[in-house]
């Protein structure tokens, strides 16, 4: 016997592939085994038993009326007559005799073989081999897509990912998270489902729905305690699965080789079925038990007509009918498969029912080979697709990232990052994380939260636990916010800083923060660069006092006018873009501080002169060359701080004397060569910065500034200091470094409050010992060359070094 197991390799496949074998493939596999057994059984009989048994035919000669036989008739006789036998001597004894052919065993074997080859129909001879070959072809066709490299690699990869997704603890955890959603989200989902149900009156929607999914409405009942027991390792494994599913989906959805190959192998099986049915039905009658054999072998055997018995004809006839039945069932199954392939839209797969049953609304529909494999899996078990769908959801992925983030950033680890910011608030900076850890909201002492380069941030309702939170910084973050969290921020948030690159990073909910006092915006608002990024109305920001815009606008945004009545400080940092239209400034009547930095201004804007409440004006890093308009500042009675630094101003007009209320004047980094004596008629000046200019002489009228506390002429060309400078008894900081001074007057000892002195970079040879009279001056506050410091008396040096 030939063992059937020898043919296993033709249909052998990995056990995991069974998930891609629908019921019809399993059924045809069993039919193939049955047909294979028929073929093997027939072949075994062919090999082990006699194929045919033949006997010569006796042909009687034609009879004549004459007593003498005709010689020619005797010769023509087909079969020679045996020689006459003598009659028995005893007539009473009867001997049984058969027909004798005088043929030996070798001749019989020769006759059998010749008649088998010449007389027996080819179908009767090769029937079992045909059955065996056809069955093997069927088996090869059924499993070819599992063996072909272009398709088997995708199948193996898919099944590997599918098994891991099915067994992953995150699947249960994700469904648990969905079942615990906020009531608000559930209500929204119900409303959406009701609306969609109203629109679709019939049972069929636009998307293809899997029949198996409709027939098995699975209800997920999740144990919360078990779902919460996802450790860090399992979280990392689930995260890796999400990445694998993403890459696999992109790869498989590009083509349809699996679908095309499955269709082709099914079509091939149908064609083969039709051929088998056609020729077997026509030839099955050729299998006969008795076969007449006429072969010209009379010279070797003495006979040429034989009557043969095909020993297996009866069995082969029954096997052939049985085989035809199996093939018919096989073919009908293949025809049903073709109907399923062409009637159903297998290149698209909708998770509509999964979305409804699980509540995960963002599971995407898939197409091409990815969709085809999911349809095949549904024929095996729809639960695989449902659990696999969890790893296609961005919501599920974000929740996993959130869980991993919470495990990584514990409250103790976050508290180690706390620091005090420029506003003297306790701040937590978080940079380039995958999300916002929920553990942040356990740090109740937090006053400022700074998020940088974090995508898809969701601010939950638990932010209400941060009772002390007043400041929020969002730098290149796309932020969504829960309605309860928004209500909390409307009541508590005082400072908001937003740095954005596109519209998604400019939160739309910021326009409703009614208690917001400070708003800092950094990003492009230019129509040439980002046409969609515009400021909406700020009229709801009733408490806004400070507005800072660092952008490249050509005019003051119209939205700023909405808060002009209560805005106190306005800052525009324009990154070199020319600020042309400033008429909106006139409407900001309550403005006390104005900064127009790097706006490419060539003149002081006339709109500034209308701001009667203005106290501080900063025109840093512009292109100012002349400030003749400064005379109009006399109308600004409250102006105390004027910053004209980092410009190209060559001289200071005498009209500056009319700014009698001026207390702080910044003129550094300009091209001023001459200091007008009228400058010092502003006798309220406490801070005067003239560093980095081309000044050579300081007028003695500087002694009039009795309130002067800070004076800097660093990096000029001054050769001597007037003695009147030392009349400024309140001077605390004196910076005269990098000049051409050669002598430091002993009168410096009159500056009893001097605590910082910079004289480095001059031509001093010795320091006056009167520096010791400056009791507030210590070694750390004295910027001087070490060698020059050693020229002081030892007691003075010791005094300065002492704490």
Swiss-Prot record:
Location, primary (coarse class): membrane
Modified sites of kind Phosphoserine: 212, 215
SMART domains tied to this protein: LRR_TYP
Topological domain ranges for the Extracellular compartment: 49-124, 285-314
Induction or repression: Induced during the earliest stages of adipogenesis.
Any one GO molecular function term: volume-sensitive anion channel activity
A Pfam family that the UniProt record links to this protein: Pannexin_like
Cytoplasmic topological segments: 1-22, 145-262, 340-803
Recorded superkingdom: Eukaryota
Job of this protein: Non-essential component of the volume-regulated anion channel (VRAC, also named VSOAC channel), an anion channel required to maintain a constant cell volume in response to extracellular or intracellular osmotic changes. The VRAC channel conducts iodide better than chloride and can also conduct organic osmolytes like taurine. Plays a redundant role in the efflux of amino acids, such as aspartate and glutamate, in response to osmotic stress.
Protein name: Volume-regulated anion channel subunit LRRC8C
Gene: Lrrc8c
